[in-house]
Regions:
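Electropositive phosphate-/nucleotide-binding environments in soluble metabolic enzymes
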Residues: 11, 15, 48, 127, ...
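Residue-level detector of flexible, active-site-proximal loop/helix-junction positions
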Residues: 74-76, 104-106, 175-178, 191, ...
Length: 254
């Protein structure tokens, strides 16, 4: 009986996730016929779900598109993903996986002025991963890169930019690169993190072996706590912030 209930809940969640995924595709015109999409597969729950949604959708008649995945190892950051698990996950979805390794230097500023200018490890890690992805995508003829940022990520980014940069914007659902023939899409942009967590638990998505040592050492972790407090004050805050982002056209950058 317990297994039956879990299957029912998993099916219900999948329907909800897929419905919001399809709505995001239509709302922000994320995917077109003949697209070749490279998915950034970190090994976390968000990227695993993103790949599953796209891989299943690729078998639907319209739009017809091709999906492959890429995992970038960061040699000098001590966290670990089970690459064999990612290979099996991709194989089950009939998706080709590309694995690359890169690294970056973390500076040691000697004064406060240099420290303010110093890029965070999170920024450097993300930027260097994307450089590898951009290079591979262009070399293999992909025209779109799909990243696994969900609605909570976009809302947190908006609050970070408002708090620390004095501007109200976020990571767009669709971003056309100016210096290369690539478009970044975020198909999970209308999906809540709590639904992803619940589905990942039911599906038994494997967690990373070791978490990133910088995971809690950033403004983003502070903003997450702030946002949790905001939701305690107003449980509808998510929808208010999302409406504001849409009203100001912050989710499309062409």
């Amino acid at each position: 009986m317990e297994k039956l209930n879990q299957d029912k809940e998993s099916h219900r969640l999948w329907h909800r996730l897929n419905e919001r995924f399809v709505k995001a595709m239509a709302t922000y015109h994320l995917i077109d016929d003949d697209d070749r999409i490279l998915v950034g597969l970190s090994g976390g729950k968000d990227s695993l779900l993103l790949l599953e949604l796209l891989a299943r959708r690729a078998h639907v008649q319209h739009p017809r598109f091709k999906v492959e995945a890429m995992h970038v190892r960061m040699a000098n950051i001590h966290y670990e993903t089970d690459t064999s698990y990612l290979e099996q996950f991709c194989s089950n979805l009939d998706v080709q996986l590309h694995v690359r390794t890169t690294s970056f230097e973390i500076g040691n500023p000697t004064n406060k002025r240099d420290a303010r200018r110093q890029k965070t490890p999170c920024f450097l890690c993300s930027w260097n991963r994307r450089k590898v992805m951009f290079n591979l995508a262009q070399a293999l003829g992909f025209n779109k890169i799909a990243l696994g940022h969900h609605q909570d990520d976009l809302i947190h980014t908006a609050l970070m930019n408002l708090t620390f940069q004095g501007r109200f914007d976020t990571m767009p659902a669709l971003l056309k690169m100016r210096k290369m023939p690539l478009t970044i899409i975020r198909p999970l942009c209308m999906i809540e993190e709590q639904d992803i967590k619940a589905y990942a638990e039911l599906q038994g998505y494997q967690k990373q072996k070791k978490l990133c040592p910088y995971e809690t050492d950033s403004h983003r972790s502070d903003i997450k706590r702030l946002y949790d407090a905001i939701e305690q004050i107003n449980p509808e805050a998510r929808y208010s912030i999302w409406r504001a982002l849409n009203a100001d056209n912050k989710l499309l950058e062409e």
